Amino acid sequence: MDRRVLFASLILFAGGAAGVGVALFAFVGVDDGATEAEIVWESDPVTGDDGSGAVVATMDGDPLVLQSVAANGTRSVRATAVGGGVEWTSPVGTGAGGGAAPADGDGGEAVEAAETSGLVTGTLGGEQVVALTTRSGSLVVFDADDGSERFVVDTGGRSAVRPAIGDVDGDGDAEVVAVSTSGGVLAVDAGGDPVFQSDVGAPIERRPLAIDFSGNKASGDDVTNGVAVVTADGDEHAVRLLDGDGDVRWTATPSVTPLSWRQADSQNGPILALGGTNGNLETLEVADGSTRYEIGLQDLPVAVGDAGPGRVYVGGSGSVWAVSLLDGEVSWKQQFGGDTRVNAPSLGVLGGGDEADPVAINREGDLLVLNRNGGVTARGSVGAVVYASPQFADVTGDGTDELIVVTEDGTAVAVDVSD
């Protein structure tokens, strides 16, 4: 396809009380000069992981793909060295202190066929960990280095909702946050001891966000730590921000029904970006829950991805959008893959550069690497269905990151997009 750029003016108009904007946009065409992506490694497929809950952790420079897997009726977390084999497998324990087994050996006591959430990684007490919750109501945390069980705590209700890791009380140390589907919110420290446990009085259906904007001074508000949750009571949805003691700081009723959401920083203070089932993007001020803007992206639905300097990147139906965090102005739209749904875009530093570039992959496994102006710098395909966002790690040892994609059958794929 010849490179083409079609420019159109941005049109904003009042659309109800919230002032919904609808945009025409700068459309950036696919560039024939783009690098063709190359698959440099694939793992074996695994049972019990469709890729949506897998994460990547780098230990001493070596990347591990961490997945929740099922084998012989037992749910486990498995770590696979990128470019190598299985490093450890740890059964999802019941708190009996079960440890990891190298490769596919047996570990400690396990929950039979436990239904679990997606995984999350972060640093607790100076060590890299991986955490999940179970449907039966446990928060389970492992050391990412060797798979040893760090702690298991009761969430206070049924869960299997992905937890979050961040400094929610502003003390300089990260906590783990888990929710129960009945409305419980639990934050624990690096040892598994409670920081707070609250109940917001309504079902929680989305993963919590660990709000940590301690270094932000733009908002003029010194309370930029806490936990954000989305609750649903029938057709009514609400966003609540809890402070570091578990008290509700504010409650907001967004115009959109949130399908995905992220936190992001901006020159005017931190915000929560909500992708609605109606195709609208709505942002709420972390300071007080007020709506900064709502804009229709002409896609249904939209998946909110990573945010970079001044922008948030959103996946739609065959589209990637770059939207200003300040006012909702659409900077550009890139189309690919027809009407195939695009997963939430990620930001990563690739090819030895010093700026993070947006990367998107759609449900058919087609991927694009874009620059800040929406131009395509690399493209390719992993040849399989993908439900998750791309992740990043240095696979080849050349000092630059490659893409890590996990497909619907649990196969981890490393993709080189360098020139």
Residue ranges and their predicted role:
Residues 1-419:
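Hydrophobic alpha-helical segments
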